[in-house]
Amino acid sequence: MNTMRPRHLNQRGKPVSRPISLYDKWLIGAVFGLLIIGLMMVASSSVMISTKYFHQPFHFLIRQACYLFVGLLLALIVVRTDSSFWEKISMPMMIGCVFLLLIVLIPGIGKSVNGSRRWLALGPIGVQVSELTKLAMIFYLSGYLVRQQEAVCESIFGFIKPMAILAVVSVLLLLEPDFGATVVISGTVMAMLFLAGVKLRYYFGLMLVVVTALALLAVSSPYRVARLTAFLDPWADQYNSGYQLTQSLIAFGRGGWFGTGLGESIQKLLYLPEAHTDFLFAVIAEELGLFGILVVITLYSILVIRGLNIGYTAYTQERHFASYTAYGLTIWLALQASINMGVNAGLLPTKGLTLPLLSYGGASMVINCIVIALLLRIDHENRWQSLGLRPLTA
C-alpha cells in the first residue's frame, strides 16, 4: 500500500492526519514497467539459445525470475534501512570491493567468461564484483563529499584523494578486463564531483586525463581496436569484427514502426550474439519496433527524472549524503542505459554493458533492485522529514 494515515505528531506537536504517499508512485510504476518488459523480452530472446544448450526453452527466463525474486527480497530489506547506515559502512565496503577486485584476478578463483575474468564463483552462483563496486564507489564518494566538501572544492589535495581510489579501481577493472564498467564508474564519479561544486579547472583537468587515458587504453589493445574499427564501419567486415553490430542493425531495420511482433524475432535465432544480455535492446527494436523503443526510453526517462528529483529534495533538506547517493545512483543507471542503447543502435563502440532492469544477468539484476530500493528509501525519508515524522524502519 502506497499511502497511510500517520498517527504521529509533527515537529510542532500537531497531529498529521492527511494521507501521505510512502514512496514515489511514478518511480515504482516505471521500474515495474521495465521489469515486466525485461522478463518478456528475456523469455523471447533466449528461447533458441536455451533450447540449444539446456534442451528447454525457458532456462534463462526461470533463472532471471529467480534473480529478480532475490533482488526484490533484498530490496525489501534495503528500503527499510536508514540511509545513514550506508554512510557508516561506505569506507569498509569500498575497501572490501577493492579486495574482491584483487581476488577475482587470481586464476582458479576468478571465473573467466568470454576472455574476461570478472566473476567470483560461489558454488553454482557467479558474482560479478564490478556491479557491487559501482555501488560501493557511490557510497564512498558521497560520504567523502559530505566530510570533505570544502577541501574538495577548494584544494587540489582534497580533490586528488577520491581520484586515487578511482584510479586503483579502474586499473583493477581494466585488468579483468572490464572497459565498460570503468567507463560507467568514471563517468558517474565525474558527474558527482561536478554536482558537488568542484572548481572547473580541476574538473576539466580530470576530464582531460580520464578521456586521454581511456583513449590510450582503447587503442592499446588489438581487441578494442577491432571493436572501434567495427563501430566506424561494421559492414566493412560484417562476418568478423563487425558481425555483432551488423546483426543488431538488421534487427533495428526489421522492426519498423511497430515491430515484427512479440516472439517473432529472426535475429534471436542465433544470428545476434548475446541477444538476451548486452543486445536485448536490439531484439526489443525488432519485435516491438520504434513504438517499443519509445516506451522503454520513456520509462527510463521517468526513472531518471524522479531519481534526480529525489536527490534535489534531499539536498534542500540538507541531507547531503542521501542527496549525493541519489544523484550518483540515478546517473549510473542513466549512463549505463544510454551507453547500452547507443551500442545497440551503432552510435557507440561495443562496451559489454547490460541494460539495467531489462537484460539477463544475476548480479546486475540484484544490484539494480537494490539501487531502486535505495532511491525509494531516500524518497521515503524526504517525505517524512518534510512533515517532521520519523521514517519507517525494519
Curated annotation (Swiss-Prot):
Top-level taxon of origin: Bacteria
Record topology, Periplasmic segments: 48-57, 110-118, 176-177, 223-278, 349-354
GO molecular function annotation: lipid-linked peptidoglycan transporter activity; peptidoglycan glycosyltransferase activity
A GO CC annotation given for this chain: plasma membrane
Annotated TM spans: 27-47, 58-78, 89-109, 119-139, 155-175, 178-198, 202-222, 279-299, 328-348, 355-375
Pathway listed: Cell wall biogenesis; peptidoglycan biosynthesis
Pfam families: FTSW_RODA_SPOVE
Reaction catalysis annotation: [GlcNAc-(1->4)-Mur2Ac(oyl-L-Ala-gamma-D-Glu-L-Lys-D-Ala-D-Ala)](n)-di-trans,octa-cis-undecaprenyl diphosphate + beta-D-GlcNAc-(1->4)-Mur2Ac(oyl-L-Ala-gamma-D-Glu-L-Lys-D-Ala-D-Ala)-di-trans,octa-cis-undecaprenyl diphosphate = [GlcNAc-(1->4)-Mur2Ac(oyl-L-Ala-gamma-D-Glu-L-Lys-D-Ala-D-Ala)](n+1)-di-trans,octa-cis-undecaprenyl diphosphate + di-trans,octa-cis-undecaprenyl diphosphate + H(+)
Localization, UniProt: Cell inner membrane
Gene Ontology terms: biological process: cell wall organization; FtsZ-dependent cytokinesis; peptidoglycan biosynthetic process; regulation of cell shape
Membership in a protein family: Belongs to the SEDS family. FtsW subfamily.
Stored PANTHER family: CELL CYCLE PROTEIN (PTHR30474), PEPTIDOGLYCAN GLYCOSYLTRANSFERASE FTSW-RELATED (PTHR30474:SF2)
Function description: Peptidoglycan polymerase that is essential for cell division.
Name of this chain's protein: Probable peptidoglycan glycosyltransferase FtsW
Species assigned in the record: Legionella pneumophila subsp. pneumophila (strain Philadelphia 1 / ATCC 33152 / DSM 7513)
Gene: ftsW
